Regions:
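Transmembrane alpha-helices and adjacent helix-loop boundaries
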Residues: 2-392
């Protein structure tokens, strides 16, 4: 495979820097000096003492080598004790340590400044005017609201996705039913009705926003309970916004998961079903023992991606009073009257949640020997599962 243009020159230059002794010393000392110059020692405290000492020691060693180089000139490699062949490899390894110390010094300055900023914001009695100071102040003083919102968001996403998975298993069985001429009229009618219901359910749910679905579910539940003669206090105890949000996420995700499972099942080789039937298994036994397990495995990446989608899409349920992360954010805004800082905090928290759960799902997919979940989108792509299955 040919190297890109310029790669050979860069490789030779890197080999020259690594092998030529004076450049290892002087180049690394320049990096150490830059790190010391950009990092005031007073702001680091005891934490920056060791990296600073290492950088100063390397600079001193490089100055000694420079003095020998100027004094000995052509005899430098032969007479200088630092330039002995046996010391070149240890010095190169020590230069890596100096680079690490220089990087630590460069990072300590901003980190120390941010820590000082956080301490000042937390100790403040009023909301600071600066953006970062105000965000830290609001995050610290509203931490109970944010913790409650994050907990509710995770509960809705986890339980809603699990419930939707089992509902999707039932609906996908109805969805893939096709009437057979050899069956009696009652069985054919039941299959047609079941498949039609699954198609209609998928069309309606996937064609309407979750925000509208949440409002319909919540107020429909209130109307049913009020029609049954329940009092308002009893209704609020039984039909809270949390339960309405959980039902909404479960019903919404069921439609998407059903299509994902259908794609995974249709990606299974039809010959396996025929082979199972030829061995004496009934249609239900062949589907349950042969086709369904493979279809579910093909669909795991897209199904796990639905959990990430639910973490983000649950934010729309705040309109019915679900105390999720978005509701907590609006509550903090109502207290401090600063929207930009609060919404930036919510964005960072959502990003952390999605990254953590994506990493966990990727590790789970590796243990199950399936493809990792793809890029996180706003909706689950039903075609993802069969496409991956055909590629494998």
């Amino acid at each position: 495979e040919p190297l890109p243009e310029g790669a050979g020159f860069l490789r030779r230059a890197a080999r020259f820097v690594r092998s030529d002794h004076p450049y290892v010393l002087l180049g690394t000392s320049a990096v150490a000096a830059l790190a010391l110059a950009c990092t005031p020692g007073a702001s680091l405290g005891a934490a920056g003492a060791v990296p600073s000492v290492v950088c100063f020691a390397w600079i001193a060693l490089s100055l000694v080598a420079l003095v020998f180089k100027v004094a000995l000139r052509r005899d430098y490699r032969r007479l200088c004790p630092i330039a002995r062949p046996g010391l070149r490899r240890p010095l190169r390894y020590l230069s890596y340590l100096v680079w690490a110390c220089a990087a630590a010094l460069l990072c300590m300055g901003p980190v120390a400044g941010f820590v000082a900023l956080c301490r000042g914001a937390i100790a403040s009695s009023t909301n600071p005017t600066g953006f970062l100071e105000s965000a830290v102040y609001m995050l610290y003083n509203g931490r109970q609201l944010f913790i409650t919102g994050v907990t509710t968001t995770i509960e809705l996403a986890l339980f809603g996705t699990v419930i939707a998975f089992f509902l999707a298993l039932l609906l996908v069985f109805l969805r893939i039913q096709t009437p057979d001429r050899g069956e009696n009229d009652a069985v054919r009618f039941c299959k047609a009705v079941g498949s039609g219901f699954a198609r209609l359910y998928s069309t309606v749910v996937r064609g309407t926003p979750m925000m509208v679905q949440g409002a319909i579910v919540y107020f429909a539940g209130l109307a049913v309970l009020r029609g049954a003669g329940w009092e308002t206090a009893h209704i609020n105890a039984v039909w809270s916004p949390f339960w309405a949000g959980l039902v909404t996420i479960s019903l919404n995700s069921t439609a998407y998961m059903m299509e994902v499972l259908r794609g995974g099942i249709e990606a299974v080789d039809p010959g396996q079903l025929e082979a199972a039937r030829s061995l004496g298994l009934s249609q239900w036994q062949a589907m349950r023992k042969v086709v369904f397990p493979q279809g579910v495995k093909n669909s795991i990446p897209a199904l796990s991606n639905e959990l990430i989608v639910n973490i983000k899409d649950s934010s729309v349920l705040s309109i019915i009073g679900v105390f999720d992360l978005m509701f907590a954010t609006t509550s903090v805004i109502g207290i401090y009257y600063k929207g930009l800082e609060a919404y930036c905090i919510a964005a960072v928290v959502y990003l952390i949640l999605t990254m953590v759960f994506s990493k966990v799902l990727t590790m789970l997919a590796a243990r199950l020997d399936v493809d990792a979940p793809g890029p996180v989108g706003s909706t689950t792509d039903p075609a993802a599962a069969p496409a991956r299955a055909r590629q494998s």
